[in-house]
Structures are given as C-alpha cells and as structure tokens.
C-alpha cells in the first residue's frame, strides 16, 4: 500500500493563521499555511509551548484564531463543527464514570438523535473495531488507561466524522501500551481512512504513524518544515527497525534541533490560556 493516500483533495486548508493570547500578549501561532488532503495522517511535533495543541484546537473550532482562515470541506471551522465533521480525542479519555463502555460510545449518537436500534448496531461495530467486544458493560474505572483511550477513540469515530483530531492521546501511557495502541490506531485508520491530525512529543511515534510530519518552531509557532513519510503501509513492529525509519527520525530530529528544540519546557513558559 502506498504511504500517501490516492485521494489528495484538500479537506482542511489553513491560510495566514495567527493566534495571539491577548491576556498575556503572546503570539502562539504566526502565519501558518497548511493544506491537509483527504485520508492523510498528519502529525504535529515541536517544542513545548510551540502551539501544536493550539493549532489543532483552532482547526476544531475550540480556539478562535486572531487572523487568517481555516476551511474544512469548503466550510468555516465553525460550520464544520456544527456539521459534526470532527471527532476529538484528548490526552485524558474524558469518559463518564457512571456510563458503561456501551453508553459512553453511544453518547454522541444519542445527541444526534439516532434511534436505539441504529445506536446499538453502531456501538457493536465500534467496540469490535477497537477490540473491546466483551467489555461493553464495564465502567471506565474497571478499565486500564489504554482501554479507556480505545473507548474514547470509538466514541470519537462513532458518528463517522471526516476528521479525527488527536491531542497527545497516548502521552500518559507506558511505552509498551503506547506502541500497541499505535498499531491499533493505524489499523483503524486504514479501515476508515478519516483524515487524522495527531499532536505528539514523540519523534518515533510521529514517524511511525504518519503520511507527513509537520515540524513546528518555538514560539511564535511557525511551520519549520514538513517531512513526507515514505514508509509503506501497513506498518508493523518491524517498521521501527527499518533503516529508512531511522533516517526519517533523524531528519525530523535535525529539523527540531535547528529550530530550538533544545529549549526545555520551563524555558518556554505559556501565557494564561495558551495551549501547547
């Protein structure tokens, strides 16, 4: 399978995007230009405080830009959110403890007015997709962190959004669980081919998952470079041992070093309300 999806029609177009947090008079993002094609898996990586999460949330209409434009399928980001074009997964699973796995996944479908039979069928499909069949009646507190994130992913994808926004979804997990979920996420993506925007601090994770890696500079966040990832899909555990994989990791690392990734998080404080 080709590393680049055959459908290259733009699904997200960002032009001249700048975000200033006025309370701290800090420019988090400056003059961002970026197009995302349908079915791409694009990772955003950069030093702490560079605006990765801010950019993702501007795309999802969770943060309003100071200037510039974001269009999604030819619509404003606001209209795209109203039309449910987005599914969003955060670092914390954000599940409701009093609802079972089944009912957590079904929540957006209830809000959209799906009838009970259609919800039941869709939840069955999604639990199978994220390999949680048999856990439908468990509550979040009965699940591991990795299983909770699978529920969160299933819920985000349940209503078939065109775009999946993921803000460091595996950042709090141990390395073994993280690598296993990387494989599971790619399996899901290869089946559904939603456009994925993925924020991470891990170079190897970004290279392993993505069709392209967008490297961001320290504040004010700009695009320092874009690295096409020409590793074939499906990717496996052996992909991480491939010589080309190491070459691409080195390419991304060098871009980060050139743009100041040596800065520690405490050397790049965030303004009030600013996101990473």
Residue ranges and their predicted role:
Residues 138-141, 159:
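Conserved signature/switch motifs of ABC ATPase nucleotide-binding domains
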Residues 45-47:
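The feature captures the beta-strand-to-loop junction immediately N-terminal to the Walker
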Residues 153:
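Hydrophobic anchor residue at the start of the ABC signature
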Residues 99-107:
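Short coil-to-helix segment of the ABC ATPase nucleotide-binding domain corresponding to the Q-loop/switch region
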Residues 110, 117-135, 187:
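Conserved ABC ATPase "signature" region
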Residues 75-92, 111, 116-120, 237-242:
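ABC ATPase NBD coupling module
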Residues 60:
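Helix-to-loop junction immediately C-terminal to a conserved catalytic motif
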């Amino acid at each position: 399978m080709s590393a680049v999806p055959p459908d290259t029609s733009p699904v997200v177009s960002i032009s001249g995007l700048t975000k200033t947090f006025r309370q701290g008079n800090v420019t988090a993002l400056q003059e961002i230009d970026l197009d995302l094609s349908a079915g791409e898996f694009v990772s955003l990586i950069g030093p702490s405080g560079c605006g990765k999460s801010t950019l993702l949330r501007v795309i999802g209409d969770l943060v309003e830009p100071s200037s510039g434009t974001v269009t999604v399928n030819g619509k404003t980001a606001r209209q795209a959110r109203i039309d449910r074009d987005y599914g969003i997964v955060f670092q914390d699973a954000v599940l409701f403890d009093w609802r079972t796995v089944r009912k957590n996944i079904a929540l957006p479908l209830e809000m959209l007015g799906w009838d009970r039979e259609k919800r039941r069928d869709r939840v069955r499909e999604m639990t199978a997709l994220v390999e949680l069949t048999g856990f439908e009646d468990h509550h979040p507190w009965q699940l591991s962190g990795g299983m909770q994130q699978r529920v969160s992913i299933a819920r985000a994808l349940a209503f078939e959004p065109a775009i999946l926004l993921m803000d460091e979804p595996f950042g709090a997990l141990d390395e073994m669980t993280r690598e296993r979920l990387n494989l599971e996420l790619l399996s899901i993506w290869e089946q559904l081919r939603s456009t994925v925007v993925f924020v991470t601090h891990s170079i190897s994770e970004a290279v392993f998952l993505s069709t392209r890696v967008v490297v961001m500079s320290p504040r004010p966040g700009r695009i320092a470079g874009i690295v096409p990832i020409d590793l074939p899909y499906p990717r496996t555990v052996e992909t991480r041992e491939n010589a080309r994989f190491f070459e691409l990791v080195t390419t991304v690392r060098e871009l980060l070093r050139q743009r100041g990734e040596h800065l520690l998080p405490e050397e790049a404080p965030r303004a009030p309300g600013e996101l990473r």
